[in-house]
Amino acid sequence: MFLVCFGTRPELIKLYPIIEEFKNKKIPFKTLFTGQHKDLITQFINLSGRPSFTLTDIMKHNQSLNSLLSKMLIKSDPILKKNNFKIIVQGDALSSFAMALSAFNNKRDVIHLEAGLRTNDMFSPFPEEANRIMISHLSNIHFCPTKRSMENLSKEGIKNNTYLVGNTIVDSFSLITNKFKI
């Protein structure tokens, strides 16, 4: 079974087509909302129903990245220990890195959507560039948006299970405009 993980608006937007495709094809899946952008929960419920799992009390005012990361790891750990999910993460947000690391630590497969994007500057954007690199090395399957992103992975020694799939933002736009008759 798949566990589709998101915590930020871009993640939700880009994972929405995956969620809808799973529903349409009756592929078993669950969703996990990390709680990074709390206002997303209402938007997600409006699009796809209530998430299967929500990590609570994650965000605190002026907390460090390490504090946020540790909370996501601690709160997701029992969920991943108990269930043999294949974890799907998108992009480079801290929530994606946290879920990829938690999955790796629980010997779960990680599927990375939007894999291989690079600026080649570890601090721009920060911490996203480092998150991208670490997620790539924790992942088993890499869905790349461009040929260049596949080449980036190859340069890092990641040559297996890389697939050129385009960017799901295009699919999201189409799905949402059709669903809401925009």
Question: Which role does the model predict for each range below?
Answer:
Residues 4, 31-33, 112, 164:
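Structural beta-sheet core signal
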Residues 24-28, 50, 81-84, 159-160:
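Short glycine/proline-enriched coil/turn segments at helix->beta-strand junctions
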Residues 27-71, 75:
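Conserved nucleotide-sugar phosphate-binding/catalytic loop shared by glycosyltransferases and other
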Residues 40-42, 98, 121, 173:
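Generic domain-boundary/flexible-linker signal
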Residues 46-50, 105-106, 127-131, 160-162, ...:
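Short, hinge-like loop/turn segments at secondary-structure boundaries
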